[in-house]
Amino acid sequence: QRLMNIEGYSVGKEVVILGSGDIGLIMARRMTLEGANVKVVAELMPYSGGLKRNIVQCLNDFNIPLKLSHTVVGIDGEKRITGVTIAEVDANRQPIPGTEVHYDCDTLLLSCGLIPENELTREIGVEMNRVTSGPNVDDKLQTGVEGVFACGNVLHVHDLVDHVSAEAALAG
């Protein structure tokens, strides 16, 4: 997102996306609108992690196929990607031999989850939560360092800005 939205770069013309959370879905649409050919969105899980409306507006409206229970099993290329192979996975998320499909592409976009950026939080000695990768907070969202509050994606990754706004109001 940063390369396209802030830096203004076109990252590729023939794209495969791994991960179907909202960011992956929105990037599929954005890259299509920027002139790229998004060949497929592959998702390891048997369901998409994105909102239904994003599946419709970002994939279905642009005829981008979504392959559930699939993952990347091969990447071709030397200095630049020239192709990606995906395969269906079983209930244990292991590739099923014989289900491989190769896509010629110059870009593999990984949208496999977000981790809160907390370098500053760690530097001031805030205790971190191993589950969320965000800081531990009390019921008012104050960390263990007096006067330091945490909310939004620094606390844990949110899908909707409405939740971030509610946390911000609580934290003051």
Please provide the spans of the model-predicted regions.
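Residues forming the flavin
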Residues: 1-172
